[in-house]
Amino acid sequence: MKYLRGLLLPALLALAPSIAAKKDEPLIETTAFKNDLINLMYFDDSGVALVQEIENGNVWRSHDAGKGWSQIKDVSKVLRITKSPYDNKAAIVLGEKKHWITYDRGENWDSFETEFPPSPVAPVGWHASDNKKILVNEIEDCFLAPCLGRTYYTTDGFKSKPKVLVEDRRMCQWAKGSERFLEGEDKHDSRILCITRGKYSDRSKDFRLLISDNFFKDSEEPKMSSGRTVQGMTNMAAVKGYIVVASKPDHSNELSLYTTQDTETWHHAQFGDHKIEEDAYTILESTNYSIQVDVMTSKYVDMGNMYTSNSRGTYFTKNVEHTNRNQDGFVDFEKIANIQGVVLVNTVDNWKEYEKSGQNKKLKSRISFDDGRSFEKLTVKGKDDELHLHSVTNLHNSGRVFSSPAPGIVMGVGNTGEHLGKYTDGDLYVSDDAGLTWEMALSEAHKYEFGDQGSVLVAVFDEGDTDEIRYSFKHGRKDSWKKIKLDYKIRARELTTLPDATSLKFMMYASRKKEGGGREHVIIHLDFADMLPKCEDKDFDDKWSVRQETDGKPSCVMGHKQLFRRRKWDAECFIGDVFNDPVPTFEPCDCDEIRDYECDFGFDPSGEGKDKKCVPSDSRKLPEGACEGDAKTFKDKSGWRKIPGNQCKGETDREKEVERPCGDAEKQPPKSNKITSELTKFKGGNFQEYYYLERNAQADDDKPNDRDKDETVVMLTDERTAWITHDHGKKWKKAVDDEIVRIYPHQYENNYVYFLTATKKVYYSEDRGLHDSIHSFQAPTMPNTERLEIMRFHPNQKGWLIWMGGKNCEKVGDKDCHTVSYISQKNGQEESWEPMVPYVKKCVFIWREAGRKVKEEQVFCEQYTNEEMGAPLQLISSDDWFKKKEVKFKSVVEFATMAEFIVVATKADDGTLHLDATLDGSTFAEAKFPPKFFDVHQTAYTVLDSSTHAVFLHVTVNPQRDQEYGSIIKSNSNGTSYVMSLSGVNRNTEGYVDFEKMQGLEGVAVANIVANVDEVNNGTKKRKQSRITHNDGAAWEPLQAPEKDSEDQPYKCDVSDKEKCSLHIHGYTERADPREMYSSPTAVGMMLAVGNVGSELTTFGEASTFMTIDAGITWKEIKKGTYAWEFGDQGAIIAIVRRGEDTDHIYYSLDYGEKWNLYKFSEHKIRVDAITTVPSDTSLNFLLWGKDSKELVAVNIDFSGLPDFKRKCEIDEDNPTAGDFDLWSPQHPLQDGDQDCLFGHVAQYHRKKRGAQCKTQQRIDHMHNIARNCTCTRRDYECAYNYERKPGGECEKIPGLELADPKEVCSKGAKEWWDPSPYRKIPLSTCQGKEMDQIGEVHACPGFEEEFEKKHGLSGFGIFLAVVLPFLAAGGIGYYVWRNWDGKFGRIRLGENGGSFDSDAAWVKWPVAAVSGLVAVVTAIPLVMGSLWNFLASRMGGGYGGRTYTSRSSFARGRGDYAVVDPDEGELLGEESDEEV
């Protein structure tokens, strides 16, 4: 949130001679300073001022309004001065670690210290009613984004040492951090609100709002208007009598604003059809009775719309369109001080042209006298020309731009004409009727200031050097300005006076030329005190008001007449009432239907003046119960509301309800108590691709009527027709009337989608295709014809696109045809495309939210050597769109970018593959594989996953067709040193691997192995078996088969002997659609799979469908035969449908598979290929995709009508089992003793109770709590590098291997070395005590003992750099060691949770939704171009589409929430990553 703060311009000096004042001129004193100055400020209601020297950080104080200055002793190296807004005697001077506070305007200072420097953003939080209660925020640690820091507090004004409030916070503030908030109420005096890290995650999507009344000994998460807590909190601010917080859901830039007037009841702010986006709104200076927000109209233009809330801060209506903004978020908007209802704004006149082509803005100034409800031109006396003034986006002085508390006196620099010109072409204008009429005061631009309640106006030339200061005693009328001549020329930097504008003394900060060259800095003190006598009663107008009726009487503004006692403009006197602000009196007016009312939320204005009406907006829903049955009319609001804060008396017809005909509104559909279905037919032979554009439920959590808009699906048929539905497939319409060859949903922003044609034209929507939001742009070239990925997206900058086009490719077979990459930073808009690199195969943005600190502009590309298509590839990098480039590797086969790692495969001269990994995009280290691992050439890699601070890598051992298998090896925390996890793992010809991680739980994975590898090496057919791990690959076991099948019959083998009789399930290599997963991120602990019980995996024809609800420890057979499945309402519904044969029904379970019910969706059978729902599995709707004879069909099945889902589920984190949920803890099946321990702790998850008749709907944080940490056991460790696991589970040195001296790393530049150990703790484990004594200790290298002690003595700061190894040292990339408080050697890890101590149990990135199967394939075997493409094309019917795997972007939209945790791009490594148009 950006705020208009008074701009404090730099200023400085040491002492210089003063100029004696003449009787007819003000007293002038000049003080010179050696250095440039900053932070020139007054203490309110006094003549005491402070200023700071920039170069040395010294602070100077004046007790006489700048006449004389003295340096404050013992205060130096100051970074910032901050005054209390609520105590005009208090201020804090912030140094690097030592700080000072005063309670007597700087006469005396007390010091206090913090461990680290203050935050540059908001270092101090003042309490509005207790000046001794203060928060101090330390600088945030941003090395591993996102930025988190520590906050201290004091309750005695730092008389005692400040105490730590909270460690990992984004921001904190007092509840009573604004004068108007809880004003006069005797409660919440010690209440503090903080936005902190997530419960078990450092990722910004998990940030929480916490409230505490006892300085965070205890804290609670407030429930928002939906009755639930909300994660993803990004910002917070106090605005008059409101506190506003903003939250951002994952995978979306859209924000939700929540407001409160007491921190107990929170409201979700509603903006009608408009979206609020991150970094795209400014909370303006608001009123005591409403919040005013300026919202950007587009991410790419500095222009907005201004909205004003009702008195509760919940419903916002649009007041001003096309407001002018700048890139810093400042808005040309100012309320005229002390005058109610008067607002000055600048608007963009040529907004259409500016929005479309970015041509220069043409600005107009407008003024409102009714708080922004209506606006009029600024007029100059005696002229017809409009006046336009420079405003907040072009500041030239500190404080307010136009006004001060001096009643009705307003000044500004601008020009007359059609539009606002340059500042230097402007003149100074003045108004003494609050902007109603203006006249030119002085020609040329001037800085200006108000004194003595407007009796004195001072101005100084602002376009260069001058030796004059101008002043007026007659409200700035044109001929009333007099000159003060200086003996030297100055360049004015700042002109200021007391904030209340009651003083006759002014200060000017300026610079002047020095003898011998250069400039010196001066503060000039001006005192007008003795120039005029004090005013008498006859000199005042006792009832001055802003506007007057035609009869000369004051007019009504905001429901009353606001009257001031003001000096007459021509009175020859000074008021001299210093430090007393002018106070108005009020006379109430009767309510007027035109003047005192505006359109209510959900209604749009139509017409002007007396003809103005408020008509229901398109997005407005009917009131509950309206137009049901045969009703012809319904009662509704009038559409009008009294303007918030309006004080008029009486009532009018505007406040009465009206009757509206039902014909004006869409009839409510009849409510059903049954499951419903809608079947839609399409022309075509295949569904080419389909994607869900899911709007995060949090964004609309308390607007259930809009739920239908949340479930948008886009789909493409092989007829090249793109379709779209917003209600999960009940009604479909064509997305665009054009031939579409590909759909690209944005990988990181669910609202964005792109429809590609075979030409340069690209259709796109930034709002999921809603509200006629589909537009088009011209790409720089046609799409490439090399079957490469055409579009790439930036994880953080949603409008940054990479386009992979083809040049000279219009003719088929043209030898000059080649690929070219382009960048747009404005979502493809006109003239925004810049060429990057030609002859490329792939270009990718490298930035990620966590763990990789690189420039947002950094891009990696694979480019053909010497710019020849088909030549060997090289990996190149740039952070300026390839104006300069760096070659990272030559002979590159492929590279993959994942959450924490970038992995690059290169081919050596002998044909072997080498793998290098990096964490930061610049320092690479070659992967060290288990010694003696390869007796043959390294032929192919598949990068499987990197979500648990380690890379899982499949290395192919046998690459022969139909005989492929390999080993899964697992890396250390920097991706360089690997140990064996599981051997003989099945792979197919395309590089896909039978490996899948469970969604929602870390460390659980399933794989299929080839049981007869020796026979397979001799050409025999594979015999496959399934294995499961519950400790992140450290140990694998067969799947426990159920005792009986679904017909209650025993199996033919002994299920107690798992080695000979276990469950085997079909894996990733056999799926038509890789988006189909065993598990769901929101149905925690549940998996479904197709397979059989026996000694090995058999065919699909012999398979049954199985289910587990305890993360794979036990399984049950639920149906004979092969079924496809989906989870709904976070596991509350499980729907299955027969796959591969004609059917007219589905089965569903509402009790985790205990009982299955049949629902018939059609009168005749259709062939179903897939069943899908929204990626988060939170919906009550499903879609079946299939064929009906020669036509394609999509069937919506809607469970929302069932009585089981009428009520919203209740969840209470404080009493988790009291409502509709139980607590469930995952277990390790082989754990000795404490079975509830998994990864060294007992985790508790929310799971809906069986039989609870309610809908969960809005996504909940399933992780409830880490109940406790467990004592370490063997299960918390895996074998270290150079060691292998023996059948008994112990780790021993690989036979015949000579271990290097661990101290050798010291000779290569390292500062520390470790004892060798056969074990390493699994990075996920948080176990404590009984740590295995084999764990190696850390030692200092010779010469670094002192640094070692100093570093390892650090404590308290959440993250610190512990050691950086050169990348050759021990194969390290440069990694960080996170240490626990007791100095015990902890795990070495990087990434999102690396910022927390092990003792914090910061292990969970919930839910784990990394790409589970194949993520990246590298192969050295040449592929015949097109063979894979043909293979994939045959599978398009499943929605997998012709695209090989844009990974999350493709399949996050269909199955499982791959977006949730790891921004794994998951490219296929190898020439399989092709794209065709």
From Swiss-Prot:
Signal peptide range: 1-21
Q: Which terms in the GO cellular component ontology are assigned? A: cytosol; Golgi apparatus; membrane
| Topological domains, Cytoplasmic | 1378-1405
Where do the record's region annotations for Disordered lie? 645-672, 1019-1050
Query: Which Gene Ontology BP annotations are present?
Result: Golgi to endosome transport; Golgi to vacuole transport; protein targeting to vacuole
Keyword Protein transport in record: yes
> Where would you find this protein in the cell?
Golgi apparatus, trans-Golgi network membrane; Prevacuolar compartment membrane
| Glycosylated residues in this chain | 288, 974, 1018, 1269
Q: Does the keyword Transport apply?
A: yes
**What residue ranges are annotated as transmembrane?**
1357-1377, 1406-1426
Chief place where the protein resides: Golgi
* Superkingdom of the organism of origin: Eukaryota
Regarding protein family, the annotation reads: Belongs to the VPS10-related sortilin family.
| Protein name per UniProt | Vacuolar protein sorting/targeting protein 10
Source organism per UniProt: Leptosphaeria maculans (strain JN3 / isolate v23.1.3 / race Av1-4-5-6-7-8)
Q: Which gene encodes it?
A: VPS10
